């Protein structure tokens, strides 16, 4: 059974996963912004666990990073 986690913990996990994938694929914030049409400031907020990603952003990030959405986000928990 899945457990609930606080939003800030979920955001921290997302930020870590995004940073790992981004740098391992040779992206920096500017190049990822160009590849996804997500503003550089928004990517910075994601990396600093300051903003919840939209579904559209998750799709665009997954496409640019050549990964599944499940590699970016944790589907095993509900967020509170």
Where are these regions (language model features)?
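A short, Lys/Arg-rich alpha-helix, primarily the initiator
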Residues: 1-28
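DNA major-groove recognition helix of helix-turn-helix/homeodomain DNA-binding modules
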Residues: 56-71
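The alpha-helix within a helix-turn-helix
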Residues: 22, 33, 62
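Short amphipathic recognition helices of helix-turn-helix/homeodomain-type DNA-binding modules
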Residues: 71-80
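Residue-level detection of the helix-turn-helix DNA-binding "recognition helix"
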Residues: 23, 37, 48-50, 77
């Amino acid at each position: 059974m899945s457990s609930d986690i606080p939003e800030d913990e979920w955001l921290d996990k997302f930020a870590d996963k995004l940073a790992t994938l981004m740098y391992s694929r040779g992206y920096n914030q500017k190049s990822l912004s160009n590849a996804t049409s997500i503003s550089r400031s928004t990517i910075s907020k994601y990396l600093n666990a300051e903003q919840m990603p939209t579904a559209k952003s998750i799709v665009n990030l997954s496409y640019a990073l050549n990964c599944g959405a499940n590699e970016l986000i944790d589907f095993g928990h509900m967020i509170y």
